[in-house]
Amino acid sequence: MTLNNLQLFAHKKGGGSTSNGRDSQAKRLGAKAADGQTVTGGSILYRQRGTHIYPGVNVGRGGDDTLFAKVEGVVRFERKGRDKKQVSVYPIAK
């Protein structure tokens, strides 16, 4: 009497797993107002992480380094020294 050792194999491999397949949402950083644009007080001018652009005249900096207008006026992106940039808001003369 012979004993047959019959072994069955799966015809499809298991699903497995991976450590990839995720991505964080975009943070929508960057300029929110263009050079020469008229803005109102409190308007966001530039969203950033760190100080890529510094606040100039009539511009404040929020806790997350967001730059915002303090007064109504015209936006100007300017150079600050040789290697820095700043954004200012100049009031419109009435």
Swiss-Prot record:
Proregion residues are 1-9
Keywords, A to Z, come to: Ribonucleoprotein, Ribosomal protein
* GO MF annotation terms: structural constituent of ribosome
Q: Where are the transmembrane segments?
A: none
Tell me the InterPro entries matching this sequence: Ribosomal_bL27, Ribosomal_bL27_CS
What Gene3D superfamilies does its record include?
2.40.50.100
Q: Where is this region: Disordered?
A: 9-33
**A Pfam family matched in the record:** Ribosomal_L27
According to its UniProt record, how is this protein modified after translation?
The N-terminus is cleaved by ribosomal processing cysteine protease Prp.
PROSITE patterns assigned: RIBOSOMAL_L27
Q: Which GO terms describe its cellular component?
A: cytosolic large ribosomal subunit
Stored NCBIfam families: L27
Task: Give the family, as the similarity comment puts it.
Answer: Belongs to the bacterial ribosomal protein bL27 family.
| Descriptive protein name | Large ribosomal subunit protein bL27
Species annotation: Streptococcus pneumoniae serotype 4 (strain ATCC BAA-334 / TIGR4)
